[in-house]
Amino acid sequence: MKTSRFDERYFSRYYGKQPVRSMNEVDHLAAATHEMVSWWGGSIRSMLEVGAGPGHWSRWYRRMHPRVRVLSTDVSEHACKRYGHELRDIAEWRPSRPYDLVVCMDVLQYLDDRAAERALRNLTAATRTCLYFDALTSFDAKHTVDRSSTDLNAHLRSGSWYRARLERGFVQAGAGLWVRKSSGLVLHELERTR
């Protein structure tokens, strides 16, 4: 991945005065994710944010759940310096231990297919309990996003491409949540998307 692409100009464009996703929006998403894992009987004691950008998830966990061990990573040297992340590329790096919650939001569309497959394997290995995953898909690019404020310079794939790979290690719970099959969490049939 070309990390120089994600420089100060990129962050100003997509996370500046009119961000693609605001801190407030991510606060709601993080709270909902945390509560859903609790609802299923899970406990989040560690959280990994991959491609953290401005680090909204990490900031929420540090503020709302200060006992949770948080690691935030990004491929952007700019983001790492500005927001305090570790410089890591999930397509090349696999954490030495799993995390209860792994968050990877709007990252994999920047990777080609081979790198995205490696990243998905590394995300699976990094996840003990639950993965929050989202990536811009070809459908989203055509039908759901504001094309004027979304970075469309990406490798657009179908949702089924991602699902086929994630379903090897996860159960899709919906709303971006994927529960690790080996986690021991029990989802009722209608809590699953399939």
Name these PLM-found stretches.
Residues V107:
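Hydrophobic adenine-recognition pocket in adenosine-nucleotide-binding enzymes
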Residues V103:
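A conserved beta-strand element that flanks and buttresses the S-adenosyl-L-methionine
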